[in-house]
Amino acid sequence: MTTIAAAGLNVATPRVVVRPVARVLGPVRLNYPWKFGSMKRMVVVKATSEGEISEKVEKSIQEAKETCADDPVSGECVAAWDEVEELSAAASHARDKKKAGGSDPLEEYCNDNPETDECRTYDN
């Protein structure tokens, strides 16, 4: 080290500068949950009819009543009624979709007005 003495002032300057070692870090595994071995399973999704949904709603209501009979403020009771609410919403959406005929507004418009530009179809 070099010291400079001027009028009773000592200033020390180091001759070596230390730099931190840069390390290349790999990706964090938490950001890629699909790469975990335990997550490699298939779940088959099946559409249910409106009748099956209404039966499931009735069954879940009975289960919620039985669950809440002992302790109406428990977490299990809240979860049971949440399931009832979700199934009721699914049944309502199924009824609305059935009422609409299962078609989107453009299809309905094209059925009424097939000569418009939006509804033309071209065959090659």
Swiss-Prot record:
Compositional bias ranges of the Acidic residues kind: 105-116
Protein name (Swiss-Prot/TrEMBL): Calvin cycle protein CP12-1, chloroplastic
Main location: plastid
Entry comment describing in which tissues the protein is expressed: Mostly expressed in flowers, hypocotyl, cotyledons, leaves, stems, and flower stalks. Barely detectable in roots and siliques. Present in root tips and lateral roots. Accumulates in the cotyledons of etiolated seedlings.
Transit peptide extent on chain: 1-47
Note: Binds copper and nickel ions. Copper ions catalyze the oxidation of reduced thiol groups and thus promote formation of the disulfide bonds required for linker activity.
GO biological process, one term: reductive pentose-phosphate cycle
Cellular component, GO, one term: cytosol
A Pfam match: CP12
Gene: CP12-1
Entry keywords, A to Z: Calvin cycle, Chloroplast, Copper, Disulfide bond, Nickel, Plastid, Transit peptide
Assembly and interaction partners: Monomer. Component of a complex that contains two dimers of PRK, two tetramers of GAPDH and CP12. CP12 associates with GAPDH, causing its conformation to change. This GAPDH/CP12 complex binds PRK to form a half-complex (one unit). This unit probably dimerizes due partially to interactions between the enzymes of each unit.
GO-annotated molecular function: copper ion binding; mRNA binding; nickel cation binding
Flavoprotein is among the record's keywords: no
Subcellular localization: Plastid, Chloroplast
